[in-house]
């Protein structure tokens, strides 16, 4: 199969079956495509869609986003995870204001310098919004190329990545680049999936080596799963009437700049903090069941300790970034999923 035929098969499939109704494709702008591409890093389309809609509803353009605080962005990002992406959006919009007069840059060399934007993301933004000729190489594309050409190796290997970039640059058409890029990503997401691919629906089936070998599972090779470590965290859930004490996490890497309950990695530290703040635990009080929260590299066993205060106590002296979170009011702050989960119990 020639390079032209490969790209034409992708384009033909996309025009008939492609996902053209994705929210960032309606009234398409550089800004919307940028937000969507950042959200889609480490997140599926299905999960990203409601977050994208809420984000654009609140910040429809660069100008409105520029008026925001980091807490505003983190609030809309709450629950989506990988919060560094939200910080990168905040940093990027400030750079765009200072260096590009609030106009989204259209040069590849300018884009790739912005926080959170690498070679593939820059190519996706420019090709999907302006139809510029820039190939992309994200997870779906890598998997398709390795299966189609029978490339054995790990996607993280430098030599494999170099080979894949070489191939995708040859295959990507100069015209209709945006449609091709979206098409090949759609095929990877809908058909050439990591598990149980729907090969009979794939436009590339005739020359696909993985299909001929009936052995798609080895393309790409998978590294042995590392043993997932388990860590513990004691959450002190301080409640006064309908309010909860939460503190901005400015030091720890996990959930940085999000608001959390006071939390500690040992029971001893938890008890010491309670004593220091003269807080007694009433064993008769309602208990919150412990639960697990998964990260990419470890699992966190969260043990909530509920403290019902009979009188208002101000903790501002110990933590200037703390607030009383009222369930009846709205707060434009970022909350990690476990904190949201605990608060939901009391709503």
From Swiss-Prot:
GO terms for molecular function: 4 iron, 4 sulfur cluster binding; 8-oxo-7,8-dihydroguanine DNA N-glycosylase activity; adenine/guanine mispair binding; metal ion binding; oxidized purine DNA binding; purine-specific mismatch base pair DNA N-glycosylase activity. The keyword Glycosyltransferase does not apply. This is Adenine DNA glycosylase. It is an enzyme of class 3 (hydrolase). The record marks 138 as: Transition state stabilizer. The lineage of its organism: Bacteria, Pseudomonadati, Pseudomonadota, Gammaproteobacteria, Enterobacterales. Belongs to the Nth/MutY family. Its cofactor is [4Fe-4S] cluster. Its EC number is 3.2.2.31. The active site is at residue 37. Adenine glycosylase active on G-A mispairs. MutY also corrects error-prone DNA synthesis past GO lesions which are due to the oxidatively damaged form of guanine: 7,8-dihydro-8-oxoguanine (8-oxo-dGTP). One of its GO terms (biological process) is mismatch repair. It catalyses: Hydrolyzes free adenine bases from 7,8-dihydro-8-oxoguanine:adenine mismatched double-stranded DNA, leaving an apurinic site. [4Fe-4S] cluster binds at residues 192, 199, 202, 208. Monomer. Binds 1 [4Fe-4S] cluster. The cluster does not appear to play a role in catalysis, but is probably involved in the proper positioning of the enzyme along the DNA strand. Keywords: 4Fe-4S, DNA damage, DNA repair, Glycosidase, Hydrolase, Iron, Iron-sulfur, Metal-binding. InterPro entries: A/G_AdeGlyc_MutY, DNA_glycosylase, Endonuclease-III-like_CS2, Endonuclease3_FeS-loop_motif, Endouclease-III_FeS-bd_BS, HhH-GPD_domain, HhH_base_excis_C, HhH_motif. PROSITE patterns: ENDONUCLEASE_III_1, ENDONUCLEASE_III_2. Gene3D superfamilies: Helix-hairpin-Helix base-excision DNA repair enzymes (C-terminal), Hypothetical protein, domain 2, Nucleoside Triphosphate Pyrophosphohydrolase.
């Amino acid at each position: 199969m020639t390079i032209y035929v490969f790209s034409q098969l992708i384009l033909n499939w996309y025009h008939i079956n492609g996902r053209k109704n994705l929210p960032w494709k309606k009234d398409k702008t550089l800004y919307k495509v940028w937000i969507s591409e950042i959200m889609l890093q480490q997140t599926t389309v299905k999960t990203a869609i409601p977050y994208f809609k809420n984000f654009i509803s609140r910040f429809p353009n660069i100008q409105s986003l520029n008026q925001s605080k980091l807490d505003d962005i983190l609030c809309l990002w709450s629950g989506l995870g990988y919060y560094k992406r939200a910080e990168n959006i905040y940093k990027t919009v400030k750079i765009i204001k200072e260096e590009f007069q609030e106009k989204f840059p259209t040069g590849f060399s300018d884009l790739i310098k912005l926080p959170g934007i690498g070679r593939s993301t820059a190519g996706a933004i420019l090709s999907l919004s302006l139809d510029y000729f820039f190939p992309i190489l994200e997870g779906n594309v890598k998997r398709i190329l390795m299966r189609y050409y029978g490339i054995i190796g790990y996607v993280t290997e430098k030599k494999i990545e170099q080979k894949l970039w070489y191939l995708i640059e040859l295959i990507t058409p100069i015209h209709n680049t945006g449609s091709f890029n979206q098409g090949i990503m759609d095929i990877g997401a809908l058909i050439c999936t990591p598990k149980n691919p729907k090969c009979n629906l794939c436009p590339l089936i005739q020359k696909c080596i993985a299909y001929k070998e009936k052995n798609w599972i080895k393309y790409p090779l998978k590294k042995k799963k590392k043993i997932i470590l388990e860590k513990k965290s004691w959450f002190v859930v301080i409640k006064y009437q309908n309010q909860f004490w939460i503190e901005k996490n400015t030091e720890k890497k996990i959930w940085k700049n999000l608001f959390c309950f006071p939390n500690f990695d040992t029971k001893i530290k938890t008890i010491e903090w309670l004593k220091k703040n003269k807080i007694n635990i009433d064993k008769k009080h309602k208990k919150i069941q412990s639960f697990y929260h998964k990260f990419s590299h470890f699992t966190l066993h969260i043990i909530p300790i509920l403290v019902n205060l009979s009188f208002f106590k101000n903790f501002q002296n110990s933590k200037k970034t703390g607030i009383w979170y009222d369930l009846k009011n709205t707060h434009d702050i970022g909350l990690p999923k476990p904190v949201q989960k605990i608060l939901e119990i009391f709503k």
